[in-house]
């Protein structure tokens, strides 16, 4: 299972929080789509921002705000070195050139960067841009980071993605994630994974064989 330091070295989204940040829990699984079997790990990140606020007596006090962020890290070899973000994690993120596409709606909705102009141009097909605009309507503050290692980090603010039919909340995290590992039905998660599979189908034209999860990929 990934550690936060490992995640933050590969993806900017795990660098949130100017005070503290930690992975509350993770859960591993696979999704079998019509063409590809996708290995994924779900992560629940909790991070804290702090700032100083001046009180009525002129003194300053430090105020802490806690936030939750959710993500799926998926084996995704078809796209590398591209970042599409509707919500930038922090001002400390590496400065990268922003690429403009032919879609004004997309340019207004996303910060689109990459390792090279060629990688961005190959990724930004009209069909993909339309798909991402629809994804933004489905998930709050959605970000997609395609690493050079062949992984996709799909991150968002929607806690409901991991909601399940039985009563329960994040109040008892160990039990919650233990149930997930045991195969608890997650009706809101698999539609999101189906969207990831749809994106894979848009970009797997250079691959002759469907992707299957191997022991090496699971490590």
Give names to the regions the model predicted.
Residues 1:
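Active-site loops and adjacent core secondary-structure elements that bind or stabilize anionic groups
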Residues 4-219:
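Charged, low-complexity intrinsically disordered regions
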